[in-house]
From Swiss-Prot:
Sorted UniProt keywords: ATP-binding, Ligase, Mitochondrion, Nucleotide-binding, RNA-binding, Transit peptide
Subcellular location per the Swiss-Prot or TrEMBL entry: Mitochondrion
Keyword Cytoplasm tagged: no
EC nos: 6.5.1.3
Enzyme category, top tier: ligase
Superkingdom field: Eukaryota
Identification of the protein by name: RNA-editing ligase 2, mitochondrial
Main location: mitochondrion
């Protein structure tokens, strides 16, 4: 397959490297992995039933964008420190025009919100992408000029999954600022940061996959969580089998709020077992699911959880149509489906809850597709698959909640 060569040019601009004294650089704190012990600690300190917000953990490289008052040059940082402008880091220079626009917009909105000038505004996020092994997606080889030399843009992660895009992208998840040069950084509460992120055209940011008490969040099955990112970066029509997400980052909803005095951890990683950094023995035996017991108890308490629909479908028109589709799964439709089936499959014990739910889901999809606009029918393949999964999920939930009554009513001896 032919490789396309794209080159972007950037001038080398003198800039004093700052960060060694720590006055500008803010190291992103390592996040603890979730396990039964840490979850029990949350229960013990009364934080378990607080509101928590889970976002997809993107598999990439930590990346910070710094806007400093009085300086035209934006600075960029990896996990270990602010980089000099000529450092090659996966080819991030190709994104500089977009990154500058993002942080400039955030600075303007944040200063207006705070009604004051701010010394530093920092967007924390993840640099990711560079690999997408789909037969219909061309392999590309791009370079970018750094310090007068062409440098190859490389994949940030090379694992078989998750894969996001053949191109490089930035995924924002935090906003911090400091008012004065000698001051400390303040972190915006998640909802405040999202309010700003969503006002910046083209910015990819960490949307809530699920939120609520920890009992609800922990019921989310990270082992079967397919990454939500590809449709957001143009790969929605190119599904990959087994493209599992790395996991979730789960934050306390009040993290960053003035006066919030937590008695336990406020940020945890819920990782898919394949990404957990622990094994059963020192010889690197099979990895273990440290959240298995917690997840089982949470499912018993809150039920199985799917990602919030808004994290999957982000186009407003498509989102409204998706909600309408789920409204097609209702008791009246279930009664109509049962009337078409009759009592014989129930008398012979040939009908199971899953089979009935599948019939209900198919009926809902059929009626929805008859009346919906062509633009909705032709949404990306990955989103269509997700919506089908939601319809089946809602159908199963409705059928299971009424199964005993259904068996009673479908008996030939039943009378009102």
């Amino acid at each position: 397959m032919l490789r396309r060569l794209g080159v972007r040019h950037f001038r080398r601009t003198p800039l004093l490297f700052v960060g060694g004294d720590g006055s500008i650089f803010e190291r992103y704190t390592e996040i603890d992995n979730s396990n039964e012990r840490r979850i029990n600690a949350l229960k013990g300190c009364g934080m378990f039933e607080d509101e928590w917000i889970a976002t997809e953990k993107v598999h990439g490289a930590n990346f910070g964008i710094y806007s400093i008052e009085g300086e035209k040059m934006i600075r960029y940082a990896k996990r270990s420190g602010i980089m000099p402008p000529n450092e090659h880091f996966f080819g991030y220079h190709i994104l500089i025009p977009e990154l500058q626009r993002y942080v400039t917009s955030i600075r303007e909105m944040l200063c207006e919100k705070q009604k004051k000038k701010l010394h530093v505004v920092l967007i924390n996020g993840e640099l990711f992408g560079g690999k997408y092994d789909h037969p219909s997606v061309p392999k590309t080889r791009k370079t970018v000029m750094v310090a007068g030399k062409p440098r190859t843009i490389s994949a940030v992660q090379t694992d078989s999954f998750p894969q996001y895009s053949p191109d490089l992208h930035f995924y924002a998840f935090d906003i911090k600022y400091k008012e004065t040069e000698g001051g400390d950084y303040t972190t915006l509460v998640y909802d405040e940061a999202i309010e700003l992120f969503q006002r910046v055209p083209g910015l990819l940011y960490a949307r809530a996959v699920i939120r609520g008490p920890m009992s609800k969040v922990a019921a989310f099955d990270v082992e079967r969580f397919v990454t939500t990112i590809p449709p957001l970066v143009g790969m929605g029509n190119y599904p990959l089998t087994g493209n599992w997400a790395e996991g979730l980052v789960v934050k306390h909803s009040r993290l960053g709020m003035a006066g919030f005095d937590p008695k336990g951890p406020t940020v945890l990683k819920f990782k898919c077992t394949a990404f957990q950094e622990i094994s059963t023995d020192r010889a690197q035996g099979p990895r273990v699911d440290e959240m298995r017991n917690v997840r089982r108890d949470s499912i018993n308490r809150a039920g199985v959880q799917l990602p919030d629909l808004e994290s999957i479908v982000q186009d407003p028109i498509q989102l409204e149509a998706s909600k309408l589709l789920l409204n097609h799964v209702c008791e009246n439709r279930l009664k109509n489906v049962l009337s078409k089936i009759g009592t014989e499959p129930f008398e012979k014990e040939e009908m199971t809850p899953d089979q009935l739910a599948t019939l209900l889901a198919k009926d809902a999809l059929k009626d929805f597709l008859k009346d919906t606009e062509p633009s909705i029918v032709n949404i990306p393949v990955l989103i269509r698959k997700d919506l089908t999964r939601y319809v089946i999920f809602e159908s199963r939930r409705l059928v299971c909640s009424q199964w005993k009554d259904i068996l009673k009513r479908q008996s030939p001896d039943f009378s009102e």
